[in-house]
Curated annotation (Swiss-Prot):
Pfam families recorded: FabA
Keyword field contains Lipid biosynthesis: yes
Predominant location: cytoplasm
Highest rank taxon of the organism: Bacteria
Family according to the record: Belongs to the thioester dehydratase family. FabA subfamily.
The protein's Enzyme Commission number: 4.2.1.59, 5.3.3.14
Assembly and oligomerization: Homodimer.
Name the UniProt record assigns to this protein: 3-hydroxydecanoyl-[acyl-carrier-protein] dehydratase
Upper taxonomic lineage: Bacteria, Pseudomonadati, Pseudomonadota, Gammaproteobacteria, Pasteurellales
């Protein structure tokens, strides 16, 4: 674990995630999470640099589901479902958070994904979404980049999987 990075903990509550969105968690040069309503998690329940399927790091987060979440009112009227792209974005958000947690500096940007599979949906009647990210590699050169596999579970059932999630940290995003 990088002990030089401020606010390193094994878990984070909602207020911590909001602080990340304001640029307060990992310092002024560290990556930020988005603010609500694009923040796709309520808490990070576990983060470690040693565990996971590849023993390169693991992060787990949760989102409490309720019918008042903003996307249910418009996606779709009469047939509310959480957009699958928001679950994918949540996984990218967590890879970026991990890069800040291990000391990476820069502005986070999603760079791609190898493969995504959707085998279920998140409805307003669901209770809880769990995101799991297994880090495969962190490249720490001129560009800091994380590579990970992830999954999204709703109420005990895995409904999305993603391989080779890529997030980079950029010092300058003007030419990105």
């Amino acid at each position: 674990m990088n002990t030089c990075t401020p606010n390193i903990k094994p878990s984070y509550d909602y207020n911590d995630l909001l602080a990340s969105g304001r640029g307060e968690l990992f310092g002024s040069e560290g990556p930020q999470l988005p603010a609500p309503s694009m923040l796709m998690m309520d808490r990070i329940t576990k983060i470690t640099d040693k565990e996971g399927l590849f023993e390169k790091g693991y992060i787990e987060a949760e989102l409490d589901i309720n019918q008042d979440l903003p996307f249910f009112g418009c996606h779709f009227i009469g047939d509310p479902v959480m957009p699958g792209c928001l679950g994918l974005d949540a996984m990218w958000q967590l890879v970026g958070f991990y890069l800040g947690w291990v000391g990476g500096k820069g502005k986070g940007r999603a760079l791609g994904v190898g493969e995504v599979k959707f085998t279920g949906q998140i409805l307003p009647t669901a209770k809880k979404v769990i995101y799991r990210i297994n880090m495969k590699r962190v490249i720490n050169r001129k560009l800091v980049m994380g590579l990970a596999d992830g999954e999204v579970e709703v109420d005990g059932r895995i409904i999305y999987t993603a391989t080779d999630l890529k997030v980079g940290l950029f010092q300058d995003t003007t030419s990105f």
